[in-house]
């Protein structure tokens, strides 16, 4: 077992456990202080039930909303134009031990992307946008499919939905404290000073943002783990996923190569937040050059702190460390 994989798994486990335990401990302590133990625990349970119900509804029926928003069309094995895409996903699914091939969709949107989603009702699904099919070759699409199917195999949606309850719990608890302190003059617990409870509510809502950053950090780890999955399960997955990442970056941000030559590590991350008119063709030699630059790029720890994906240079360097094929 590669040590980098072991370290990544350990970090993910510690992050998940740490966010959960710290979040619940903070919420219970604050609720007990402001409202007393009995009412505080009841309030936390009520908030959890509320946000859990909302998340479950979103999870179960979200795939149908995604299909509507992205104007997706399902690809069948006999599709005369995109049947190759279904067979590609089927091959990668076999490498990853799937009993059934996830449903394959093409999304009619103007930016290159691929994503995995699903629910017990909708089943497992993977979608590719039209621009990404024009941008990448079949081997690169296969590597991207290895990444996306890794999300389904590792149940990342369910895990992040569960951990995401923590910042929501802290925020709504802060909301209760805010209005409770503002109108009731305090709670029933030890912290019966209305002004203090009001201030505590503001602090808790701010703290929820900090916990959201922690969840984003976990999300980046899961994305890195999906990269690892592609490298370890798809033949040629490392090199092809690296090229795919470079092509996607250059498609959305043609100046990225020149900036990285100048040792800039932050500007391109901001530009990728916006959906611009993507370039449909990126020369492979440009992508290879960008990959080589990324391999030696030193990325500040804060470069991707607000992002849900790791900085691409970090992804390239991790793939080099864990590749099997």
From Swiss-Prot:
MF-aspect GO terms: metalloendopeptidase activity; zinc ion binding
Keywords, alphabetical: Cell membrane, Hydrolase, Membrane, Metal-binding, Metalloprotease, Protease, Transmembrane, Transmembrane helix, Zinc
Record's subcellular location: Cell membrane
Signal peptide: none
GO cellular component terms given for this protein: plasma membrane
Family indicated by similarity: Belongs to the peptidase M48B family.
Name this protein carries in UniProt: Protease HtpX homolog 2
